[in-house]
Amino acid sequence: ESSAASDVYKRQHTYSHKNLTKISEDERTSQVEDTADIIESITGTRSKLVRPPYGAKNDDVRATVKYPLILWSIDTLDWKTRDTDSTVAEALKAVDGDIVLMHDVREDTAAAAEQIIPALVEQGYKLVTVSEMFEAKGIALENGKAYRKAR
């Protein structure tokens, strides 16, 4: 199994995409831990990172979510524009250490990725997982802390 493929199961986005700042501590914990349990039961690997829905976080989220919170430094707005060219243009603004937000359930985003990946590789970038990027930069991820980029 490749490192990138295995890392997919080390991150999660909660069970039902609820805004973690607007639910109780018990529900917040359930959203994250139940999802981690499901991922682990299917893959044998427990998730190690969380991307909070909407990027929503506050002190309560930071205190109760026992994982690093992975946000983004570039939002392609693919969910809003639904335009492949726009998504490509935004993603290609990335510089070393950026985290680019894209939604893998959209066909136009998948089409954009088919253009973005070779373009970034041609520019000399190595595409890695979030965990690999932070490790390469010597940045230790801490539970409850939010990260937008690795630099």
Question: What residue ranges belong to the model's regions?
Answer:
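Single conserved hydrophobic/aromatic residue that forms the stacking wall/gate
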Residues: E1-A5, Y9
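Catalytic domains of cell-wall/extracellular-matrix polysaccharide-remodeling enzymes
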Residues: Y15-R148
